[in-house]
């Protein structure tokens, strides 16, 4: 089955060098408590509903052939056991309060969409970034064919990855990838399991593999008070020790933000991020200085 595309973002300047088109795929093996794109976690189509946009015209109830929408205590409720995710209710929703997330693309369709912005790539040194969710856990045959096609057409290809995927997936595609934007969240394995649901051993092993084959590695570290940022920078220092022997092209320190809260409401998912905070600007500079002191030169706060 073809992977589902969550979004195609044009003119991105935060997902690699130059002006880029970022393709977000649905589905991720991690379950990060602070996930900024909860609609990307599921490998299947998701339904999102924004009650603040809804005018309660109830047209969707009348038009749903599966009788999957009802009113309970004045609110519209979707009955998951009846909903076929057919999209019929979307066609009659004048306010756009209802949406289905996830579309299939033939490789030729996706490449055609990407190539619309070729002139921007050429003039800015940009290209395409494949992101997610987790792109490295998508159908390998599809992914391999996509990156080969883009590479053969002279388009710079970046992979934004959490690193939690079979090593053979990286072995298959790395020759046609220009750079990897590689997330490192935590060094401590128990903490990694606590906050993401998975061990970080596979992630760190894949990172070492990419280094061994000479891949261009760009590290991205989300900085979150209460997760990997503390008074003594213990976790950051452990991350530095992991990265020290590797050939790292750049490091992006990404301050936590909570602008995604509305997405959880639209997905009817529990929002668990109230405990997290963005580090102060002083702390961010302190962490940046730590990396500089350890001979990492290309350090940036932000995307």
Spans of model-derived segments:
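FAD-binding FR-type
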Residues: 82, 103-109
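Short glycine-enriched, charge-decorated loop/helix-capping segments at active-site entrances
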Residues: 40, 99, 193-199, 268-276
